């Protein structure tokens, strides 16, 4: 695997949550800096060193509701 994509969203209680697409990896943190570190650590724990993705992409998703 060359690349792994995480969907990142703001948590309702504050902070951020990230989940990997196609893998059972989930992590959360209070700040984006902490989240980046947690994502790297979670990927290291999930994959053997020779099978870890070379690229980790964070895709930020933000939802807004507009009403009239």
Locate each region found by the language model.
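Residue-level signal for pocket-adjacent positions within structured domains
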Residues: 20-21, 51
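A short, exposed loop/beta-hairpin motif centered on an aromatic-Gly-Thr core
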Residues: 23-33
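Short, charged, surface-exposed hinge/linker loops at domain edges
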Residues: 1-5, 33-68
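Short aromatic-glycine-(Arg/Gly/Cys) micro-motifs in beta-strand/loop hairpins
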Residues: 8-20
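Structural detector for hydrophobic anchor residues on beta-strands
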Residues: 4, 16, 25-27
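Short secondary-structure boundary micro-motifs
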Residues: 1-2, 9-11, 29
């Amino acid at each position: 695997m060359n690349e792994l994509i995480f969907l990142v969203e703001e948590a309702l209680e504050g902070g951020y949550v990230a989940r990997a697409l196609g893998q059972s990896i989930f992590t959360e943190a209070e700040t984006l800096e902490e989240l980046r570190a947690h994502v790297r650590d979670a990927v290291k724990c999930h994959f053997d060193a020779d099978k870890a993705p070379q690229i980790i992409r964070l895709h930020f998703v933000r939802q807004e509701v507009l009403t009239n």
